[in-house]
Amino acid sequence: MAEVTINNSPIHGDSILTAVYGETGPNWSRFHTGTDFAPYGSTPSNPDLYSVCTGVVVNVITYTGTQALGNQVVIQDDSTGNFWRYCHMNAPSPLSIGDRVTTATKVGVLGSTGNVTGPHLHLEYGTTSYWSYDTFLNPSDALGIPNARGTIVHYDGSVVPPEPEPEPEQEIKKHKFPWVLYARKFRNR
């Protein structure tokens, strides 16, 4: 069984991969379209879920009893332009469309809404915010973890990037002789 430690895990604790991208079988119409994370070891059974990227929320789907993937939130990744979809959350995401997220942002709580065999996070990754089989990508590749059922994923919170500092407002320089600043402006051209 493989074990990896990453700083952008959706579960800030230990988890185990219970199904992986590309698997086939009776549970899926064509193939498994995401990576399934379940709590492992001392991690609570319904842990908070966190963004795996810096990005923006583009969709929040509330489970009404008919969606196979239950409560969902979709985030567009700033670094790739691709989309992450978190599925089966126990309640609708606390986020709204347009909210900015980082790897320190809680996106929801692991659950079992929709078609499930037990509580887990089904995490999808794709090139569009609407999903079709030709737009899916392997989430394990994007996270840098093995695409293997039974892989244990450890979260290393010590390497979470800090929240970005707000841009300081540009300070207006003052000089006892204002013409000096005016002259410098032209000298630097």
Located regions from the model:
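A structural signal for short beta-strand/turn segments enriched in small hydrophobics and glycine
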Residues: 49, 55-57, 98-110
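Assembly/oligomerization scaffold segments
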Residues: 37-38
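Residue-level signal for pocket-adjacent positions within structured domains
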Residues: 16, 32, 84, 105, ...
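Zn2+-dependent peptidoglycan hydrolase active-site motif and core
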Residues: 22-23, 30-33, 46, 51-94, ...
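Acidic, glycine-rich catalytic/binding loops that coordinate metals and/or anionic ligands
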Residues: 1-11, 16, 41-43, 96-102, ...
